[in-house]
C-alpha cells in the first residue's frame, strides 16, 4: 500500500557507537555516537524538521562523560550536512554531592530544527530519605527573559508522595510594549 509508506527508495545509514567502561565494574565512563542517513533521492513525504527528507541528513551526535561518582555531562548536536552549521546544541550536566544535587542544561536550535535558545538550572537538597527541597529556573535567550521559577518541597514514604510547589511563570505578550 503506497499511501502508508513514508520512506521508499534506496538509502543507507552510516554511524558508530564507541564506549569506554570503568575498570572493575560495568559502569560506562565515556560514550560517543555519530550517524548520518544517505538517500538516493529527496523524499518530500518526511518532515523537513528532521532533515531525513534530504539526500544527506544532518550529522547526529551524542557524547556522554560520567565523572567518578559525582555526576555526568552530556552533549547532543546536529551538524548540517554541509558540515558548516550547528542546527542543534544541547549540553546537560548533573553533579551530586551527597544530599545536594545540581543540574544545568543549555539548548540552542537553529534553522529547520526550531527556534529555542535557553538555559535552565536547578538545585535539590535531600534532608533525608523522605524530605526533599528543590529550586529551578529557566532563562530564555531569544527573549532575554526569565521564563519560570520553581520551588518545591516533597515528602515521600513507601507508596505515598506529597508535595507543595510554587511555580512562577513569566510570559511575553506580543501586544504589550515595554516603556
Residue ranges and their predicted role:
Residues 1-154, 158-179:
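Outer-membrane beta-barrel translocator/pore domains, especially the C-terminal barrels
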Amino acid at each position: 500500500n503506497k499511501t502508508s509508506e513514508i520512506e521508499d527508495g534506496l538509502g543507507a545509514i552510516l554511524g558508530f557507537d564507541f564506549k569506554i567502561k570503568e575498570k572493575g565494574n560495568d559502569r560506562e565512563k565515556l560514550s560517543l555516537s555519530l550517524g548520518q542517513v544517505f538517500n538516493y533521492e529527496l523524499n518530500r513525504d518526511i518532515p523537513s524538521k528532521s532533515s531525513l527528507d534530504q539526500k544527506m541528513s544532518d550529522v547526529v551526535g551524542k557524547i556522554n562523560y560520567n565523572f567518578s561518582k559525582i555526576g555526568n555531562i552530556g552533549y547532543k548536536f546536529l551538524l548540517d550536512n554541509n558540515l558548516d552549521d550547528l542546527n542543534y546544541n544541547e549540553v546537560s550536566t548533573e553533579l551530586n554531592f551527597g544530599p545536594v544535587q545540581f543540574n544545568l542544561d543549555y539548548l540552542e536550535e537553529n534553522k529547520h530544527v526550531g527556534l529555542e535558545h535557553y538555559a535552565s538550572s536547578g538545585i535539590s537538597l535531600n534532608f533525608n530519605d523522605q524530605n526533599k527541597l528543590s529550586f529551578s529556573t529557566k532563562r530564555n535567550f531569544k527573549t532575554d527573559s526569565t521564563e519560570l521559577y520553581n520551588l518545591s518541597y516533597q515528602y515521600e514514604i513507601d507508596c505515598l508522595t506529597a508535595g507543595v510547589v510554587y511555580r512562577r511563570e513569566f510570559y511575553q505578550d506580543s501586544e504589550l510594549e515595554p516603556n
